[in-house]
């Protein structure tokens, strides 16, 4: 068995109350790492009754995805700790830059300095330039706006960048020699019709990550990007799942654990010679040239 050498490493994971982030928390804890998770439950357009019905039915779609986002991390933390791991959680709105140093302070108080930073939080509201694409069906598609652009970039780009800056600042102050940063993008970052601000804000993170890799390598920090393909975090409708199962070379929709395991690898000693790389995790749904 390969030892990733992650025992007692301290991992800070954002967006970890559900989906990929929650799976990553469990995966790192399984390797003996100590986990601090953060998340934020922003308001959504659905009623509590609609969210509850979606959870009960388990049928994928925007309502179920938003229901998953509204979960606390309490059950995740309880599960990790009951299985012999060490985990804490704190809810924080990372679109407010003043919350970021507070988050690191709290992690240090509970567990110690952060060795591995996993930026995984996301904000996604479908936006378009084209009025003919606007609809209220599903999760809805709205015209792009200053407010919409700003919110996507504040959460999906700026917060990632400030988290990396805060990580490095503290890393240097304690004269650390080993570090890992893993950022989550999307396979649609290059372009996404009717989801333009989400895609652009994720593309920005890919650039920030490569720049960070170039600047931080001399300190012993690797920075890599995970680009998930079709992963069922609640948003995929049954018809989507059917199409993906048919058209993906590996014949199935991805699960959060598929991405989490790649994150663990990128943090491991075995990935010591990887930095500035975008790793597509999508079962071959997209074949990058």
Identify the function of each model-found stretch:
Residues 17-18:
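Conserved glycine-rich cofactor-binding loop
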Residues 26, 169, 214-215, 272:
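Alpha-helical segment proximal to the catalytic Tyr-Lys
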Residues 31-75:
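Conserved glycine-rich Rossmann-like NAD(P)H-binding loop of the short-chain dehydrogenase/reductase
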Residues 66-71, 91-103, 146, 257-258:
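The beta1-alpha1 cofactor-binding region of Rossmann-like NAD(H)/NADP(H)-dependent oxidoreductases
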Residues 122-130, 136-148, 152, 161, ...:
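Catalytic loop of short-chain dehydrogenase/reductase
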Residues 217-222, 274-276:
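Short, small/polar-rich loop/turn modules that mediate ligand/substrate recognition or access, typified
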């Amino acid at each position: 068995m390969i030892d990733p050498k992650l025992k007692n490493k301290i991992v800070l994971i954002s967006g970890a109350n559900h989906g990929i982030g929650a799976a990553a928390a469990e995966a790192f804890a399984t390797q003996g790492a100590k986990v601090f998770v953060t998340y934020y439950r922003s308001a959504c357009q659905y009623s509590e009754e609609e969210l509850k019905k979606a959870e009960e039915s388990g049928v994928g779609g925007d309502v179920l995805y938003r229901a998953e986002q509204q979960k606390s991390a309490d059950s995740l933390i309880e599960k990790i700790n009951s299985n012999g791991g060490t985990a804490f959680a704190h809810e924080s709105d990372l679109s407010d830059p003043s919350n970021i140093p507070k988050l690191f302070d709290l992690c240090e108080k509970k567990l110690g300095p952060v060795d591995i930073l996993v930026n995984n939080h996301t904000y996604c509201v479908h936006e378009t330039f084209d009025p003919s694409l606007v609809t209220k069906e599903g999760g809805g598609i709205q015209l792009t706006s200053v407010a919409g652009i700003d919110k996507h970039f504040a959460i999906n780009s700026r917060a990632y960048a400030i988290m990396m800056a805060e990580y490095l600042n503290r890393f240097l102050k304690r004269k650390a020699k080993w570090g890992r940063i893993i950022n989550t993008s999307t396979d649609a970052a290059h372009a996404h019709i009717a989801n333009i601000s989400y895609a652009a804000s994720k593309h920005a993170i890919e650039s920030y990550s490569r720049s960070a890799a170039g600047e931080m390598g001399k300190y012993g920090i690797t920075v890599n990007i995970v680009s998930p393909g079709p992963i069922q975090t609640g948003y995929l409708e049954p018809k989507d799942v059917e199409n993906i199962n048919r058209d993906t070379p590996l014949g199935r929709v991805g699960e959060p654990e598929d991405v989490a395991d790649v994150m663990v690898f990128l943090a491991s000693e075995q990935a010591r010679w990887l930095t500035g790389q975008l790793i597509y995790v999508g079962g071959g749904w997209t074949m990058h040239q």
